[in-house]
């Protein structure tokens, strides 16, 4: 059975992607911050879903990913769907910094952990939900736009490391 881990699967695009993979018969690892939502997903497909509470802004997030990989007996596909974005016309520093903490620092933590896992295995797939905002800034959400541009450029750079059998 193929195995996918989705970070940020408790709502939105991540949750819908998890549902699609479950319908296709995959074993799905779902992770996010909200334990009650993770439990709902697990109960919707017992035996097919593994869960792990992960906050990508925490330094121990890669360790939590390792725990989920172990629970699942491995990982074939990694999807990062966690991210935040708020309109911030007043440029409140707290909003900008929180956005960067999740969409840059958390992104690096999780993508690098998945990259190293697949590098050791010699194969695997990494996917990230980014945004069209990464191609042209949104004046109402400067940090969001900048962090999505960062993600796109980072993934382009990782693609240059394609000497291993890992796709992005």
Identify the role of each PLM range.
Residues 81-87:
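Conserved NAD(P)H cofactor-binding loop of Rossmann-fold oxidoreductase domains
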Residues 88-101:
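Short alpha-helical oligomerization interface
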Residues 131:
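Residue(s) in the substrate-gating loop at a strand-loop-helix junction
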């Amino acid at each position: 059975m193929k195995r996918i881990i989705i970070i940020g699967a408790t709502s939105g695009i991540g949750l819908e992607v998890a549902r699609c993979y479950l319908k296709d018969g995959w074993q799905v690892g779902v992770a996010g911050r909200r334990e009650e939502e993770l439990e709902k997903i697990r109960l919707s497909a017992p035996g097919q879903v593994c869960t792990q509470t992960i906050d990508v802004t925490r330094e121990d997030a890669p360790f939590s990913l390792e725990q989920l990989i172990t629970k699942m007996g491995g990982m074939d596909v990694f999807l990062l769907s966690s991210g935040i974005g708020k309109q911030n016309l007043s440029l409140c520093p707290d909003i900008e910094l929180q956005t960067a903490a999740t969409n840059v620092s958390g992104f690096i933590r999780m993508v690098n952990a998945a990259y190293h896992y697949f590098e050791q295995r010699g194969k695997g797939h990494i996917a990230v939900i980014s945004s069209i905002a990464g191609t042209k800034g949104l004046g109402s959400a400067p940090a969001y736009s900048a962090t999505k541009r960062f993600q796109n450029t980072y993934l382009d750079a990782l693609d240059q490391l394609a000497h291993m059998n890992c796709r992005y």
